[in-house]
């Protein structure tokens, strides 16, 4: 048995879960007219309503006791102080230091992190302004018009999600494109309409050895030099973001064109660093600073707010309750704002790569449910795709509904229609409709008894489906920064409670190693006899069918 399961709060939550499974949220709302006020958190720029979950005051108190018994506040202090809480890699976890709004020295292992970050930001600002103002010239002397960000995972998904969410702030000084897939179809499609003499590539890789990224970067260099007929043109068209400056220089990128990363920043938490260069180039450095400021706002709230009023902590506790104690196996992220169309994919990586593990930080096998699988889609699209499953499947899927009060493009009538669906869905998922109501409705519509008997069971919705509602006042850089940081801290709190190291990704590394071996076999046409018969047969079929 895990040490977590011996905690008094854990045992109480197990008992409460058995009791709550027989309750309905409709009853809880009927019994307490103050339920929304008790189970919601309002910040200056956003609101969290978690009242549509199968909880009451006793449950919340037990969840808060669990956070106390698992020392969430102590671990939070350790993270912000720069202690090495990434146990398996012996590293500090300091993505929050990238958005500190202070000049105060922050010394980690003899290095002033504040100074490093401020110097990096200053270098980024100079570079961004030079490119956006047309002073950075390509090999032919023409200004840069297009940026191609080459990366994968955290080096791609975070920046792309943000630039998509905030594209209404872009003034068109440059056009930003992203390449992440090693399938050559993507880079070929991105490069096809571009003019080599006007393109600047950002190669983002912490190690500068990531196979997918380096393959795409080599293709980009070949594309450029075949047009310029000059290998020296690389210096004017390539910059790198990496923690491995030597590898980047060996690749051909000049030292002055290399921006630093640090080992205390994980890839999926790195958009606040120079990994976010594409964001700043697209939106302007001032908007990038607003993004950082919004994340810092949430950092301060996370540090200072009591856990019962703490936006990220409550998100984490509700997720632990729904997954570990009530048994939900997945969670939907459902943005009702077109600008957030990549948010689900971003949060899928952030949460599942962080906490999708089954071994505790002590090395013991975990025998309780940890992170749910994260999935979803833009809300309106989802309504016509998988909401049937959310409403009537025998699997209960908790969902986060995320919307904004003000639309970035206020086309008359559209936002009200969108938000009417937003509010209706959370109510419908909770309230449902019983068979008595269905029969009465069908009878009122003049249906005969035979029809009612046949159809009524199919129209029953049990309801009692848990949801969180997050409402931002608008989608702007500062509010988006706060939202992203809230989910980052949610993931951290989940990891602490579940006794998981949230900042490594060994499952990713295993596949990388095997892929490298198989790639060699495919290139040499020499399939190893060490594979299982399925893999060996697939490789042989692939080779013979080429």
Curated annotation (Swiss-Prot):
Specify whether Acetylation is a keyword of the entry: no
Q: Where in the cell is it found?
A: Cytoplasm
Gene, per the UniProt record: pgi1
One of the entry's Gene Ontology molecular-function terms is: carbohydrate derivative binding
Q: What does this protein do?
A: Catalyzes the reversible isomerization of glucose-6-phosphate to fructose-6-phosphate.
Cite the active-site annotation. 353, 384, 512
> Reaction catalysed?
alpha-D-glucose 6-phosphate = beta-D-fructose 6-phosphate
Q: Which GO terms describe its biological process?
A: gluconeogenesis; glucose 6-phosphate metabolic process; glycolytic process
Q: Which NCBIfam families match?
A: PRK00179.1
Q: What is its EC number?
A: 5.3.1.9
The UniProt keywords, alphabetically, are: Cytoplasm, Gluconeogenesis, Glycolysis, Isomerase
Family the UniProt entry places it in = Belongs to the GPI family.
Q: What class of enzyme is it?
A: isomerase
PANTHER family linked = GLUCOSE-6-PHOSPHATE ISOMERASE
Name the record gives this protein:
Glucose-6-phosphate isomerase 1
HAMAP family, sorted: G6P_isomerase (MF_00473)
> Which InterPro entries does the record associate with it?
G6P_Isomerase (IPR001672), G6P_Isomerase_C (IPR023096), Phosphoglucose_isomerase_CS (IPR018189), SIS_dom_sf (IPR046348), SIS_PGI_1 (IPR035476), SIS_PGI_2 (IPR035482)
The yes or no answer to whether the keyword Cell membrane is present is no
Q: Name one Pfam family in it.
A: PGI
Pathway as given in its UniProt record: Carbohydrate biosynthesis; gluconeogenesis; Carbohydrate degradation; glycolysis; D-glyceraldehyde 3-phosphate and glycerone phosphate from D-glucose: step 2/4
A single GO cellular-component term on record? cytosol
């Amino acid at each position: 048995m895990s040490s977590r399961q011996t905690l008094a709060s854990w045992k109480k939550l197990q008992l409460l879960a058995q009791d709550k499974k027989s309750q309905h949220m409709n009853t809880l709302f009927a019994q307490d007219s103050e339920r929304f006020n008790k189970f919601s958190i309002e910040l200056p720029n956003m609101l969290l309503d978690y009242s549509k979950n199968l909880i009451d005051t006793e449950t919340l108190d037990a969840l808060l006791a669990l956070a106390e018994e698992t020392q969430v506040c102590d671990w939070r202090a350790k993270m912000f102080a720069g202690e090495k809480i990434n146990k398996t890699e012996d590293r500090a976890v300091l993505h929050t230091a990238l958005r500190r709004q202070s000049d105060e020295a922050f010394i980690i292992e003899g290095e002033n992190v504040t100074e490093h970050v401020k110097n990096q930001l200053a270098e980024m600002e100079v570079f961004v302004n030079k490119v956006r103002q047309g002073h950075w010239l390509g090999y032919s002397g023409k200004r840069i018009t297009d940026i191609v960000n080459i990366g994968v995972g955290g080096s791609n998904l975070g920046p792309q999600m943000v630039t998509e969410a905030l594209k209404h702030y872009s003034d068109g000084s440059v056009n930003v494109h992203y390449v992440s897939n090693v399938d050559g179809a993507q880079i070929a499609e991105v490069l096809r309409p571009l003019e080599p003499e006007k393109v600047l590539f950002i190669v983002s890789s912490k190690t500068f050895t990531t196979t997918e990224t380096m393959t795409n970067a080599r293709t980009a260099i070949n594309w450029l030099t075949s047009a310029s007929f000059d290998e020296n043109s690389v210096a004017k068209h390539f910059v790198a973001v990496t923690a491995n400056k030597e590898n980047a220089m060996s690749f051909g990128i000049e030292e002055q064109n290399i921006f630093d990363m640090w080992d205390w920043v994980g890839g999926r938490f790195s958009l606040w660093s120079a990994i976010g260069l594409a964001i700043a180039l697209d939106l302007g450095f001032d908007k990038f600073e607003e993004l950082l400021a919004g994340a810092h706002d949430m950092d301060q709230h996370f540090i200072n707010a009591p856990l019962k009023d703490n936006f990220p902590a409550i998100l984490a506790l509700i997720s632990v309750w729904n997954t570990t104690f009530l048994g939900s196996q997945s969670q939907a992220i459902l943005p009702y704002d077109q600008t957030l169309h990549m948010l689900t994919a971003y949060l899928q990586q952030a949460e599942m790569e962080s906490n999708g593990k089954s071994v505790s930080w002590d090395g013991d096998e975990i025998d309780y449910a940890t992170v749910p699988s994260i999935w979803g889609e833009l809300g309106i699209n989802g309504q016509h795709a998988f909401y049937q499953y959310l409403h009537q499947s025998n699997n209960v899927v908790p969902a986060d509904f995320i919307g904004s009060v003000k639309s970035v493009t206020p086309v008359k009538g559209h936002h009200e229609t969108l938000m009417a669906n937003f509010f209706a869905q959370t109510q419908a998922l909770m309230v449902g409709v019983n068979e008595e109501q269905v029969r009465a409705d069908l009878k009122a519509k003049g249906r005969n008894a035979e029809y009612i008997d046949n159809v009524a069971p199919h129209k029953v919705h049990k309801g009692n489906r848990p949801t969180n509602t997050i409402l931002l006042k608008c989608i702007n850089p500062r509010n988006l920064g706060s939202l992203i940081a809230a989910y980052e801290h949610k993931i951290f709190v989940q990891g602490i409670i579940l006794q998981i190291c949230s900042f490594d990704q060994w499952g990713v590394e295993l596949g990388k190693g095997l892929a490298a071996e198989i790639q060699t076999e495919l290139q040499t046409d020499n399939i190893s006899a060490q594979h299982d018969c399925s893999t060996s047969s697939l490789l042989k079929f692939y080779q013979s069918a080429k």
